[in-house]
């Protein structure tokens, strides 16, 4: 298999279609600096995501978005393709109420990356993520209400989300 800590039992479960084992393999392969292992990480994460593994969906979306941002200046067309992949997987994870995916998806709507810019939808996604416990979304929502970014300024809501974020961090 490789020099990575992959047990035969884990590999066999992944090969048998166990999405949790597939995602675990993806995470192990991703720890390597080897390009072949990184490709295997993507392959196993895709298998897990296609079988409904929500964290794998988010993981792929984040990975594709990161890669797209890196490629933006060098190859805008390739970057766009990866932003589209990122959006698709983040949207899938968001449908399953994955808080971090909702927050990242909000950025696509805020910036207009591969979707039409929609500040209202962006704010709604941040709010959903905050309500699901995503601390960064709580901080973002406090700032949104404090400065009136796509909403009316509302100091009461800003204070509420600021306090909620602080409480969640304790």
Label every PLM stretch briefly:
Residues 24-31, 59-73, 102-111, 143-147:
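Hydrophobic face of amphipathic alpha-helices that form TPR/SEL1-like repeat modules
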Residues 2-8, 35-44, 70-89, 116-125, ...:
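Structural signature of tandem alpha-helical TPR/SEL1-like repeats
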Residues 26, 30, 43, 57-58, ...:
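Residue-level detection of beta-strand scaffold positions
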Residues 7, 11, 19-23, 58, ...:
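Alpha-helical tetratricopeptide repeat
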Residues 11-13, 47-48, 91-93, 128-129, ...:
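Canonical positions in the second alpha-helix
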Residues 16-18, 31-32, 51-54, 67, ...:
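Short helix-capping/linker turns of helical repeat alpha-solenoids
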Residues 83-110, 119, 126:
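Eukaryotic tandem repeat interaction scaffolds
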């Amino acid at each position: 298999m490789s020099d990575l800590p992959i047990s035969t039992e884990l590999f066999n479960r992944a090969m048998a279609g166990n999405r949790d084992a597939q995602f675990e393999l993806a995470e192990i392969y991703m720890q390597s600096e080897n390009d072949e292992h990184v490709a295997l990480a993507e392959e196993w994460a895709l298998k897990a995501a296609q079988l409904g593994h929500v964290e794998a969906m988010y993981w792929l979306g984040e990975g594709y978005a990161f890669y797209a941002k890196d490629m933006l200046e060098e190859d805008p067309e390739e970057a766009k393709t990866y932003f589209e992949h990122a959006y698709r997987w983040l949207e899938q994870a968001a449908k399953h109420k994955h808080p971090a995916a909702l927050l990242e998806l909000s950025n696509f709507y805020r910036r207009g990356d591969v979707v039409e810019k929609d500040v209202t939808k962006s704010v709604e996604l941040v709010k959903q993520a905050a309500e699901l416990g995503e601390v960064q979304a709580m901080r973002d929502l406090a700032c949104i209400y404090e400065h009136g970014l796509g909403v009316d300024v509302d100091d009461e809501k800003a204070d509420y989300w600021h306090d909620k974020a602080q409480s969640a961090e304790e």
